[in-house]
């Protein structure tokens, strides 16, 4: 909306809403988004689904993604920088803008340290000492946004991994064939399909994020 109508109109229409969302998270209002001192958002997903990878069997998540989720924190960083840009010309919001930029600086440094591995792609989530190195499309969110904690070289290298391991003519795989648990066949009983749902079958909608990342 800001790109189409301009920042001024966007600020007039949605500025308070954007500010309220960030304040809600920063002040600890959300029951499952915890802002840590390192600038990253932590969420508990061990017992319930918290992301779009929401397959459930017997009331428990098939993919219990928990801790620092890569797409949550990519979106968090983007939101902070966008809000700071949205209110950059508003002198009454100078202290808020400074606060958001300070948090975003921490987020960016921690994001790279936490998610970017030696192979050039982003791990899917990190919870304490456990890092999920599965190659999944959630990293595309962080690669596709206007404000990214990664520099252009880092984004390009990560996208090359996505292209090599996840891109298909029909969409983006939900898991790389090289990653543990890969199962591209969505057939069988409801339970069998739930177990396979995010373990390899391609999703056409993820091509949007891929295209945005590619163009950047």
Describe each model-derived feature in a short phrase.
Residues 1-9, 74-94, 141-152, 208-216:
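Well-ordered alpha-helical scaffold segments within catalytic/enzyme domains
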Residues 2-17, 29-36:
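Short secondary-structure capping/junction motifs at helix and strand boundaries
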Residues 10, 88-99, 168, 189:
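Serine/threonine-rich low-complexity intrinsically disordered regions
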Residues 11, 15, 66-73, 97, ...:
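Amphipathic, non-membrane alpha-helical segments in soluble helical-bundle scaffolds
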Residues 11-26, 77, 81, 97-112, ...:
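Hydrophobic core segments within long, regular secondary-structure runs in both alpha-
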Residues 13, 17-21, 36-37, 149, ...:
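Short, charge-rich amphipathic segments
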Residues 27-68, 106-205:
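Extended glycan-interaction surfaces of carbohydrate-active proteins
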């Amino acid at each position: 909306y800001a790109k189409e109508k301009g920042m001024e109109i966007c600020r007039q229409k949605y500025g308070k809403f954007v500010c309220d969302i960030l304040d809600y998270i920063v002040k600890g209002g959300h029951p499952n988004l915890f802002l840590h001192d390192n600038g990253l958002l932590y969420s508990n997903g061990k017992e319930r689904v918290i992301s779009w990878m929401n397959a459930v069997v017997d009331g428990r998540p098939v993919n219990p993604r928990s801790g620092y989720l890569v797409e949550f924190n990519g979106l968090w960083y983007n939101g902070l920088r966008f809000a700071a840009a949205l209110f950059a010309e508003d002198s009454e919001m100078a202290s808020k803008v400074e606060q958001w930029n300070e948090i975003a600086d921490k987020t960016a440094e921690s994001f790279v340290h936490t998610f970017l591995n030696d192979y050039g792609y982003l791990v899917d989530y990190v919870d304490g000492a456990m890092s999920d190195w599965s190659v999944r499309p959630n990293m595309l969110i962080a690669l596709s946004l206007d404000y990214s904690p990664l520099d252009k070289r880092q984004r390009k290298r990560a996208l090359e991994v996505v292209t090599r391991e996840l891109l298909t003519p029909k969409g983006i795989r939900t898991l790389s064939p090289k990653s543990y648990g890969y199962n591209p066949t969505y057939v069988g009983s409801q339970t069998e399909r739930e177990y396979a749902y995010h373990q390899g079958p391609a999703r056409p909608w993820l091509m949007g994020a891929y295209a945005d990342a590619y163009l950047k």
